[in-house]
Amino acid sequence: MKRPRPQPSRPRGRMVAAMAASAGLVAASPALADSCTVSVPTLAFGAYDTINALTGTTTVTVTCTHTANPATRFNYVLALSSGPGSYASRQMTGTGDTLTYNLYTTAALTTVWGDGITGGTATVAGSFNVPGGAGRSGNDSQTIYGRIGAAQNVLPGAYSTATPITITISY
């Protein structure tokens, strides 16, 4: 007599994408029944004048494709690593100098976007519906707010984050 095969439960997916202050990357990781990608364009601050703070933004887009018939609601959480430096002071290097900056969860620039575990950091959560039907997809976007603090006496030149900041998505 044959035993029925146990049906696997759908695990929570986990995906990692890398983002540097001067470069954006796309990465994907399939879950059992669905696949999601994270797209992160470059966060380019522009010209820094050493007297005033400088802000910039970029948008993280989460896109999931459904492989089954019923409609699905995707809930996700985005966490960022500290990259080089720490959550208190992320760093870009160039021309022999270091320029400190940070990434925030809102335009108010009060809560550092991090892992949600390390003191004072928070993650960003979102959700969206994907209609039923194989190959149907949906997406949601979150804004990353960046700020370079004022009064950093650095030489002119191009600055970038040599070690990428990692974005982890749990869904």
Located regions from the model:
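Bacterial N-terminal signal peptides that target proteins for export
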Residues: 2-19
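Predominantly extracellular/luminal cell-surface or secreted proteins
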Residues: 79-81, 102-106, 114-116
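N-terminal small/polar-rich segments of proteins
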Residues: 32-96, 129-171
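Extracellular beta-sheet repeat scaffolds used for adhesion and glycan interaction
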Residues: 108-137
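Substrate-binding/active-site groove segments that recognize
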Residues: 99
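N-terminal signal peptide c-region/cleavage motif recognized by signal peptidases
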Residues: 28-30
